[in-house]
């Protein structure tokens, strides 16, 4: 919490940090999930961080929204969203933002190095706009809540059915699946998405990644999203995935990724099943199966031909284990192979 945070914000954040609440996403969120990640790449081919209380991050952000709601305006014009100044002097278009205001479709909100703002995403959530950020309201429809992040960093929290909130970037689109996340884009159009609640789909062309709670994915202009990796993934795995996703890593990078992967990295290997060349797919499956045993109904033959039901069944097992491992970190010792307490 920085020195610019108003006292009322600090109080609400502190209260929110004491609320132990968490909900696992529903099972039926994932029909046909593998068809949304199996895009062909245009080219073939950080150190671990300390634990953070994942269940509290969205709640702390919700405290900021509570402050906004207390002072929100009455009627908002059609095709516009409410916006609130948090610090400094953000601009909406060319006009300085007062305490509260609106941003209309087509308008840009811009912050400098000392200003911040909060955008209310209709009635389904909010976006915290960090310093040095430029973001535009693209659509304000009930079925399509859409922003475009040109550069900078945002934190988004949405409580709504999947696929109602979108953030376009130069490297693709973040699609909300009931989630909270931080999205950063640099001046080159490259960036990172870090999911702190639920799941996010990041898509560019035919290439898609499903990023769960506690995972990150790098994004690159003209390449789209990289393979998701755990917050504490080994550096060797991150380097191998970067070579596969954004360079011509080839078989050597695949072997490097498989050698570095742990049971906690099953989400990454599951994505690789549909991303590597067919001759390498068996090695990926065998390594994945050794780290997280496949559930009933999952066979090597089905996985190798990218059968929809097979991959979805395996994914449901992998993502539940990852969810339990992340959400209970520091509370229970969860076996990363099975998701059960040890």
Residue ranges: model-predicted function:
Residues 1-4, 100, 340:
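Acidic, Pro/Ser/Gly/Ala-rich intrinsically disordered segments
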Residues 2-35:
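A short, acidic loop/turn at secondary-structure junctions
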Residues 44-55:
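Short, low-complexity patches enriched in S/T/P/G
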Residues 69-108, 112-113, 121-293, 297-300, ...:
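Flexible, surface-exposed loop/linker segments and immediately adjacent secondary-structure boundaries
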């Amino acid at each position: 919490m920085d020195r610019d945070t108003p006292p009322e914000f600090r109080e609400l954040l502190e209260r929110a940090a004491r609320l132990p609440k968490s909900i696992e996403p529903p099972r039926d969120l994932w029909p046909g999930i593998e068809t949304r990640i199996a895009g062909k790449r245009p080219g073939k081919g950080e150190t671990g961080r300390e634990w953070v209380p994942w269940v509290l991050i969205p709640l702390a952000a919700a405290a900021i929204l509570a402050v906004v709601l207390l002072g929100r305006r009455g009627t908002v014009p059609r095709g516009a969203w409410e916006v609130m100044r948090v610090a400094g002097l953000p601009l909406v278009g060319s006009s300085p933002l007062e305490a509260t205001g609106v941003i209309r479709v087509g308008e840009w909100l811009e912050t400098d190095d000392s200003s911040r703002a909060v955008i209310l995403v209709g009635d389904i959530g909010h976006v915290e706009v960090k310093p040095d950020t430029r973001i535009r309201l693209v659509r304000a429809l009930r079925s399509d809540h859409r922003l475009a992040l040109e550069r900078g960093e945002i934190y988004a929290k949405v409580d709504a059915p999947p696929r109602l909130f979108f953030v376009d970037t130069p490297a693709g689109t973040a699609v909300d699946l009931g989630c909270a996340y931080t999205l950063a884009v640099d001046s080159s159009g490259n960036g990172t998405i870090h999911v702190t609640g639920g799941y996010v789909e990041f898509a560019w062309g035919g290439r898609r990644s499903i990023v769960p709670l506690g995972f990150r994915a790098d994004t690159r202009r003209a390449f789209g999203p990289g393979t998701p990796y755990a917050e504490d993934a080994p550096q060797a795995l991150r380097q191998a995935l970067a070579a596969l996703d954004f360079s011509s890593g080839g078989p050597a990078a695949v072997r490097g990724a498989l050698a570095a992967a742990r049971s906690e990295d099953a989400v990454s290997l599951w994505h690789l099943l549909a991303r590597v060349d067919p001759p390498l797919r068996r090695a990926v499956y065998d390594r994945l199966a050794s780290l997280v045993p496949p559930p009933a109904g999952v066979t090597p033959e089905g996985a190798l031909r990218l059968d929809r039901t097979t991959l979805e069944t395996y994914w449901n097992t992998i993502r539940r284990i990852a969810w339990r491992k992340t959400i209970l970190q520091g509370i229970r010792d969860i076996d990363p192979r099975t998701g059960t307490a040890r």
